[in-house]
Curated annotation (Swiss-Prot):
Keyword Transcription regulation appears in the UniProt entry: yes
Organism (species): Mus musculus (Mouse)
Matches recorded under InterPro entries: C2H2-ZF_domain, Znf_C2H2_sf, Znf_C2H2_type
Region annotated Disordered, chain positions: 1-86, 313-351
GO biological process: regulation of DNA-templated transcription
Recorded name of the encoding gene: Znf467
Biased amino acid composition, Basic and acidic residues: 54-64
Residue location of crosslink Glycyl lysine isopeptide (Lys-Gly) (interchain with G-Cter in SUMO2): 97, 368
Protein name: Zinc finger protein 467
UniProt keyword terms in alphabetical order: DNA-binding, Isopeptide bond, Metal-binding, Nucleus, Repeat, Transcription, Transcription regulation, Ubl conjugation, Zinc, Zinc-finger
Disulfide bonds: none
Length: 594
């Protein structure tokens, strides 16, 4: 400061020198400020109008603001707050780390007002940068530079987000380093696979996957992990800890990434669109899995047969068929039917089995194994059991040999011999306890059970009609929208359902794969075959509720019911006179030809 004033005087500017303070006081205001900083705020700058130094303001004392100035008398140092301070300023002084006491002492002295056109040697601190550095939050006591801290906006913990992925960072430098990974410009690259990393430590951790190192074992089971964070995350499966709750519905999750994916269900956000169709997805993995429908890719292939799958869980479910067959070959004395419900049970993990059956008390390590086991209890009260599995039926096989069973999957109740099906009996692990029909997937069984219960959980928003499955609802909604997405490649005719297109294509190919077992007549669709078989069996399942007359086809019943209705049959489009009878009940229906 002294050198600056001397330089100004040499340039021709008139700047007064600081007056000498009395003997009891420090020699000048600058030394006084320096002693104040060295004593950590025990005394403040003493000044008054009587002996004011140039550039200093009045009313700055070592005592309280209301104490009178004692002039040249020595005053006892007291710990007092500076004038104009508010509660919390002392907290701010404690928060800021003092690196240069001399520089802070000089900042106490203001630049002379008549030299305001010159740059000040005491730069004003950037309050916004100071707020970012020390993360001042709303409600912080005190003020800084005349600005109330309670008015400052909160600063996000990680304000910088990556546009390529969903990760966020605290500063721009870390964000730029991360973005180099998307461009393949990481400073540390793995010599084995070429993957880039921002830090060498991350690359060394990654190399454990190539060497197969898993130094972190689980104390509850036999699993091992390459990172401690993965072990910590895995231990939550044993402890049941879910530390990440959803603020909207209260549902808790064991991983933060699962919480982020779940929160998109509340916001409706689907940031990943498909380039082939209009579908959007919440996760990138779901988009990749969906795109296999367009590309036809099936990356998961069975090692025991030639079948391949689009999803890994489909491959795991398919491999149960081979596992059941291998158990049968290894233990010929104890046959295990692959279509038995117990054949689909997943081996329980080592350790406790928390899922117990309420009927027999048997415990299981997986909840799905308990659900499969409980289906056995649903067969109670069915007196006619099966000799090969634990399923039962209400129908006596001796009295009705045509009753369909899981071990005769090629027949259907009341439908005669059916065509060969794509799913073999060895792949049917889920069976209906009501009719015994087998399914390859559990969700197919759940959808089939709605036929027996009459449940129709899917309602049309336009007409209110309800359906037992979502695909049926989607197909029905095309009747309102008029959409016909399935076009015939031969004639261009379009259909609302894929099954209707397949039935129509038989017209061009002349294919009639469904043959009648009685008269050997062939049909292009199974529905036509079932309708034809009513001639041989004499079945008339559609009866009129008013006259008890029965019909083999529903269309014949609808046409018959017009007789009982108020509206007469539509008149023929000709110039012939109307019939002689006038009573609608005397109308004779046209003959029916089979």
């Amino acid at each position: 400061m002294r050198e600056t004033l001397e330089a100004l005087n040499s340039l021709g500017f008139s700047v007064g020198q600081p007056e000498m303070a009395p003997q009891s006081e420090p020699r000048d205001g600058f030394s006084n400020a320096q002693e104040k900083m060295s004593s950590r705020g025990e005394s403040t700058l003493h000044s008054c109008s009587g002996h004011e130094t140039p550039g200093q303001k009045e009313g700055i004392h070592t005592e309280q603001a209301e104490a009178p100035c004692m002039g040249s008398q020595a005053s006892t140092p007291q710990k007092a707050e500076p004038a104009g301070s508010v509660p919390g300023e002392e907290w701010m002084i404690r928060k800021v780390k003092v690196e240069d006491e001399d520089q802070e002492a000089e900042e106490e002295v203001e630049w002379p007002q008549h030299l305001s056109f010159l740059p000040s040697p005491f730069p004003t601190p950037d309050l916004g940068q100071l707020a970012v550095t020390y993360k001042l939050e709303p409600g912080t006591p005190g003020a800084l530079g005349g600005i109330a801290l309670s008015g400052w906006a909160p600063i996000p913990e990680k304000p910088y987000g990556c546009e390529e992925c969903e990760r966020r960072f605290r500063d721009q430098l870390t964000l730029r380093l991360h973005q180099r990974l998307h461009r393949g410009e990481g400073p540390c690259a793995c010599p084995d696979c070429g993957r880039s990393f921002t830090q060498r430590a991350h690359m060394l951790l990654h190399q454990r996957s190539h060497r197969g190192e898993r130094p972190f074992p689980c104390s509850e089971c036999d699993k091992r992990f390459s990172k401690k964070a993965h072990l910590t995350r895995h231990l939550r499966t044993h402890t049941g800890e879910r530390p990440y709750p959803c603020a909207e519905c209260g549902k808790r999750f064991s991983q933060k990434i699962h919480l982020g994916s779940h929160q998109k269900t509340h916001t409706g956000e689907r940031p990943f669109p498909c380039t082939e169709c209009e579908k959007r997805f919440r996760k990138k993995t779901h988009l990749i899995r969906h795109q296999r429908i367009h590309t036809g890719e099936r990356p998961y292939q069975c090692t025991q047969c030639t079948r391949s799958f689009t999803h890994k869980q489909h491959l795991v479910r398919h491999q149960r068929v081979h596992d059941a067959a291998s158990r049968t070959r290894s233990s010929p004395d104890i046959p295990v039917a692959p279509h038995s419900p117990t054949a689909s049970l997943t081996p329980s993990p080592p350790g406790p089995k928390p899922f117990a059956c309420s009927h027999c008390g048997q415990s299981f390590g997986w909840k799905k194994n308990l659900a499969t086991h409980q289906s056995l209890h649903l067969t109670e009260g069915r007196p006619f059991g099966c000799d090969e599995c634990a399923l039962g039926t209400n129908v006596d096989p001796a009295a009705e040999p045509s009753a369909c069973t899981p071990h005769a999957p090629d027949c259907g109740p009341g439908s005669g011999p059916a065509a060969p099906q794509r799913t073999t009996s060895s792949e049917r692990s889920f069976f209906c306890p009501d009719c015994g029909r087998g399914f390859a997937h559990g969700q197919h069984l759940a959808r089939h059970r709605r036929v027996h219960t009459g449940e129709r959980p899917f309602a049309c928003a336009q007409c209110g009609r309800r359906f037992g499955s979502r695909p049926n609802l989607v197909a029905h909604s095309r009747a309102h929208s008029g959409a016909r997405p399935f076009a015939c490649a031969q004639c261009g005719r379009r259909f609302s359902r894929k099954s209707h297109l397949g039935r129509h294509q038989a017209v061009h190919t002349g294919s009639r794969p469904h043959a009648c077992a009685v008269c050997a007549r062939c049909f292009s669709s199974k529905t036509n075959l079932v309708r034809h078989q009513a001639i041989h069996t004499g079945s008339r399942p559609f009866s009129c509720p008013q006259c008890a007359k029965s019909f083999s086809r529903k269309t014949h019943l609808v046409r018959h019911q017009r007789i009982h209705g108020d509206a007469a049959l539509p008149a023929p489009a000709s110039n012939l006179s109307a019939p002689a009878w006038s009573n609608p009940s005397e109308v004779v229906p046209p003959p029916i030809f089979f």
